[in-house]
């Protein structure tokens, strides 16, 4: 039936094409032979398809099982033609006075609640006197005959079968056939009917009425599996295999995230996990009497971190502004003002490279805790992260494909306490170095340049001491940090906002937490001496003048705030995107960002 209709449509289109524009040219003998051969092959293919459908329907009828999903004829056509056909069908429907986009549909129960309410029914049972109304998106369509069809209706990530039988429908047979021929995969529909279980034991709704709420005009990616079973749910801490996704093309998945969420069941769980991560952090900090605040995202000075900012312009004030690279300075001003425990979860913007672990726009949590130091924050970090992993996964160990999905996953253990390594001591031991104590000297800079050359550690200009140290630490220390590891006691030259170490001159009370060789967390005892802070800013200006545009700028407003007195304070920052990557076995940061930064399409 569908094949014949498709063939007839093609003939009509061909006739319309022939009837307009230029006179059709006469075909040569060879061209005629090729055309006749093509038509013969199409006819043979059509007959074979019809025979296959008849056999499949007969087999399904004999076994009492619904047929497996097969590609609808119109889904075999070119996607552009499919879209145009759907637009025409929509116009025809509107011409009859039917609104394919109704304002309201009263769904009295969700798909999840429907499953919970009726899952205990016996095989073959039907509650014909009960009426339930569901709404969702059709993801698969299977026809046993023109009067018996099966749909998989998805709502809220859950699936229920729609058992559409002409005998139980309010429509006459011819209307039933016509209506269901127009229903396509991807359409959002409302279904009113009674609950029951099929002979195979699948919970279903037997519709008396189906209402199209929003038609899908584009061809949907086809389910990889012919069956209609919901895949085993993915859970945080488990490994993933994107090769099993229905939609696998990365460009399409990231640019059309709505489509990714529609057809890749697991992706919804990834972003639900991200939401749970944020909720856990918020609940944890609220439980410690922290106050959540909001600070400006546009600043006159790009301060609080060493990074290249995005620049914008305020027309009314005729002034340059910078998108924030960190909320740190504002949050510490609030602690000066007497808000002893504050935190902010929000976006930061850095005009830097895009790679597997970096996106120009990313999410962090920063908190500041008066009367605490970095030792307190180490303990707090261990408690928070180990507790989060335990709550989300049921244990402290997670699986992560650090070397690609084609290789076995590694195990990352969040069991507290975490490993700690002293930055300079460990670097000197591993690289057999004897780094000069005065890191601000030319001697130290020359020594580190030679060390990088010796071990073939690349450090593009400007080769400041800070950048050289950072590259060496990345090469030697970070590579050892698979399980959660604190790298502690950074040099002052690397930490302009951190307080000097109370017993080790030249160092600061700072730590960075690395997991799977990537930084996840950064914290320190805050520098609260305004004189020393101003000196540190001035040292950063020298690096900026040397060409390091990531060096911090001098913020007079912040220095003035420090002059009013900042209590002993511990400051802490966490990258939520990278943490979510670990908990969801994601090797690309774009996997955990709903709308990641993408290059313009050609």
From Swiss-Prot:
Cited SUPFAM superfamilies: Class II aaRS and biotin synthetases, Nucleic acid-binding proteins
PANTHER family in UniProt: LYSINE--TRNA LIGASE, LYSYL-TRNA SYNTHETASE
Biased amino acid composition, Basic and acidic residues: 38-53
Lineage, opening ranks: Eukaryota, Viridiplantae, Streptophyta, Embryophyta, Tracheophyta
Name of the protein in its database record: Lysine--tRNA ligase
Annotated region described as Disordered, given as residue ranges: 1-78
Species of provenance: Oryza sativa subsp. japonica (Rice)
Enzyme class of the recorded protein, top EC level: ligase
Keywords for this protein: Aminoacyl-tRNA synthetase, ATP-binding, Cytoplasm, Ligase, Nucleotide-binding, Protein biosynthesis
Signal peptide coordinates: none
PROSITE patterns the UniProt entry points to: AA_TRNA_LIGASE_II
InterPro entries: Aa-tRNA-synt_II (IPR004364), aa-tRNA-synth_II (IPR006195), aa-tRNA-synth_II/BPL/LPL (IPR045864), Lys-tRNA-ligase_II (IPR002313), Lys-tRNA-ligase_II_bac/euk (IPR034762), Lys-tRNA-ligase_II_N (IPR044136), Lys-tRNA-synth_II_C (IPR018149), NA-bd_OB-fold (IPR012340)
One Pfam family, short name: tRNA_anti-codon
A Gene Ontology term for the protein's cellular component: cytoplasm
């Amino acid at each position: 039936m569908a094949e014949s209709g498709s063939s007839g449509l093609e003939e009509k289109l061909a006739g319309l094409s022939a009837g307009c524009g230029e006179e059709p040219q006469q075909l040569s003998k060879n061209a005629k032979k090729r055309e006749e051969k093509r038509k013969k092959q199409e006819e043979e293919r059509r007959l074979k398809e019809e025979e296959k459908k008849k056999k499949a329907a007969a087999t399904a009828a004999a076994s009492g099982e619904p047929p497996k999903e097969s590609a609808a004829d119109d889904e075999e056509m070119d996607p552009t033609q499919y879209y145009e056909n759907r637009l025409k069908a929509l116009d025809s429907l509107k011409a009859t006075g039917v609104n394919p986009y109704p304002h309201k549909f009263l769904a009295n129960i969700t798909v999840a609640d429907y499953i919970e309410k009726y899952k205990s029914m016996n095989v073959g049972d039907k509650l014909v006197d009960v009426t339930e109304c569901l709404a969702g998106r059709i993801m698969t369509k299977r026809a046993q005959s023109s009067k018996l069809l099966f749909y998989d209706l998805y709502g809220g990530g859950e699936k229920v079968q729609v058992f559409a039988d002409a005998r139980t429908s309010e429509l006459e047979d011819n209307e039933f056939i016509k209506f269901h021929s127009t229903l396509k995969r991807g359409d959002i529909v409302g279904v009113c009917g009674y609950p029951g279980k099929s002979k195979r034991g699948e919970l279903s709704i037997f519709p008396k009425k189906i209402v199209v709420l929003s038609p899908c005009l584009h061809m949907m990616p086809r389910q990889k599996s012919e069956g209609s079973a919901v895949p085993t749910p993915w859970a945080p801490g488990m490994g993933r295999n994107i090769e099993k996704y229905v939609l696998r093309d990365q460009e399409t998945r990231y640019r059309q995230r709505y489509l990714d969420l529609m057809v890749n069941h697991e992706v919804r769980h990834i972003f639900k996990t991200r939401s749970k991560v944020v909720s856990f952090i918020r609940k944890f900090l609220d439980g410690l009497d922290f106050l959540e605040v909001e600070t400006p995202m546009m600043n006159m000075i790009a301060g609080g971190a060493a990074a290249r900012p995005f620049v914008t312009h305020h027309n009314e004030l005729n002034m340059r502004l910078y998108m924030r690279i960190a909320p740190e300075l504002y949050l510490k001003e609030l602690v000066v003002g007497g808000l002893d425990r504050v935190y902010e979860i929000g976006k930061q913007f850095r005009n830097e490279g895009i790679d597997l672990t970096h996106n120009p726009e990313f999410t962090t949590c920063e908190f500041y805790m008066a009367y605490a130091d970095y030792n307190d924050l180490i303990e707090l970090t261990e408690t928070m992260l180990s507790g989060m992993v335990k709550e989300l996964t049921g244990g402290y160990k997670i699986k992560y494909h650090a070397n690609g999905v084609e290789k076995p996953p590694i195990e990352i253990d969040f069991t507290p306490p975490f490993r700690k390594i002293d930055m300079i001591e460990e670097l000197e031991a591993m690289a057999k170095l004897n780094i000069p104590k005065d890191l601000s000297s030319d001697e130290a800079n020359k020594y580190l340049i030679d060390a990088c050359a010796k071990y073939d550690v690349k450090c593009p200009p400007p080769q400041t001491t800070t950048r050289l140290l950072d590259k060496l630490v990345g090469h030697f220390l970070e590579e050892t940090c698979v399980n959660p590891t604190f790298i502690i006691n950074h040099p002052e030259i690397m930490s302009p906002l951190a307080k000097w170490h109370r017993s080790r001159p030249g160092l600061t009370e700072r730590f960075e937490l690395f997991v799977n060789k990537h930084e996840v967390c950064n914290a320190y005892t805050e520098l609260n001496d305004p004189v020393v802070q101003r000196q540190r800013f001035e040292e950063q200006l020298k690096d900026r003048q040397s060409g390091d545009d990531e060096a911090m700028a001098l913020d007079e407003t912040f220095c003035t705030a420090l002059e009013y007195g900042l209590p002993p304070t511990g400051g802490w920052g966490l990258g939520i995107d990278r943490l979510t990557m670990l908990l969801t076995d994601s090797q690309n940061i774009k996997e955990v960002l709903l709308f990641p930064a993408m290059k313009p399409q050609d």
